[in-house]
Amino acid sequence: MGMPMVPADTIINRFLQRLTGAVIRGFDRYMPEPFAFGIVMTLAAMVLTYSATPADSHDVVLAWGNGLSSLLPFITQVCLTILFAYALAHLGPVPRYLERLASVPKTARAAYGFVTLFAGCVSLIAWPLGTILGGLMARQIALSFRRRGIPVHYPLLGGAAFSGFVVWHMGYSGSAPLLVATAGNPMEVLLGGLLPVTETILSTFNLVTIVLTLATVTIVAMQLGPSSAEIEEIQEPETDQPASSVPQEHTIRRVGIADKLENARWLTTTLGLILMTYVVSWFYVKGVQLDLNIVNWTFFAACLLLARSSSELTQVFMQAGRAVVPTLLQYPLYAGIMGIMLNTGFVAQIAGFFARIGTTESLPLIAFFSGGVINLFIPSGGAQWAVQGPAFLEAAKVLGTDPALIVMGIAYGDQWTNIIHPFVVIPLLIMTGLPANKVLSYSFIMFLVATLPLAGGLIAASYF
């Protein structure tokens, strides 16, 4: 008698489980916490730049030091996003709505797929929402499942939420495609005009690739659940009570007009309405354009309108303030790394090398892989495009490659390695309370499988 046939899906599941186990063990053993990793990356960037460019050690240190403060406006924006999003999730009816949404998936497998899809969809709307709301949803689902007595693996929920971010640069807030569609952008002369979003973000090949990529990572996330014995549930206590139930800093209640103002709803509501008027006017004038500033002011207006008083809002912000500390500590390190790579010309050197080895059909794919490599050192879509774009657009002009494919190839590479980057994952770690190695071990699996639809989409668009 012949050997019994093993179903193909069983073989695939066994392979994924073994691969996941190996990756988790590797990350657990070799992946330090993000601040330590940032120091290691800094030293590595210094050594690489010193070895591969004419810059001497003094030049490298100066480039690093000059870069440290380059992201301060961005750091402030991200900190405010974290602060407002955290507060918004704990004010008024929002916790109940989040809980209702978190109750949609009924099984652990459905939860892993749901949070991946949710994070991917909000990432397509605006990239700041991907890691913030994705992390909040992962946490809320974990709490919901614990209340219902259903075991769910919290690290996988976090990794799945982060993996949904793999499509952000294909969406509405994609830096590179929006820049080349904007009048007066630095690449306009090189492109011979503007490149409309109908040829990049809204192109058929990009829309199809979005669907295939999200479907791939969602399906794979649903297969990665560990055995019952290995499940790690969320450990934190329930903290979704309104801020008014949290012990107040002032144990002695003040009297008079000061107390009335601090506890008056009309005060925060008035400012919230004024701010919301500005937000509506902004969208009316500029259309549905999302950036960090308008996202922050929209969140802040919502917080003001939902808060019962300035006292309640202050208490919630005080709780949220602890979540901002890791961002303030770690982001300057990556700003320094960007300074090294940009100010010494090392990134332009890398981009130029990759651009020279391409052919008409292969150049978009090379842009994709080189974009992934460069993003590890410059995790900023706009900055990366500014450095990498000129070399690849020049090569595309010579080879006759469609510039839209170059733009999206670099965008795909940027978002591809974002989901394994300790810098990018910080907001999600803050929202979930999970350690980096547990989240990145799962998102690394998604990084591997996302290669197929992302690269495949570019290949299909190049040849067909």
List each model region and its residues.
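Membrane-interfacial loop-to-helix junctions in multi-pass transporters
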Residues: 31-33, 68-75, 103-114, 147-156, ...
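Hydrophobic transmembrane alpha-helices of multi-pass small-molecule transporters
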Residues: 1-83, 202-212, 219-330, 446-451, ...
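Alpha-helical transmembrane segments of multi-pass membrane proteins
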Residues: 108-123, 148-173, 192-198, 361-375, ...
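Membrane-core helix-loop-helix motifs of multi-pass transport proteins
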Residues: 138-232, 424-457
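Hydrophobic alpha-helical transmembrane segments of multi-pass integral membrane proteins
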Residues: 104-137, 329-344, 355-394, 398-399, ...
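Membrane-interface helix termini and inter-helical loops of multi-pass transporters
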Residues: 54-66, 188-196, 285-289, 343-356
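Juxtamembrane transmembrane-helix boundary signature
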Residues: 75-96, 122, 129
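Flexible loop linkers connecting adjacent transmembrane helices
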Residues: 19-23, 59-64, 89-105, 140-151, ...
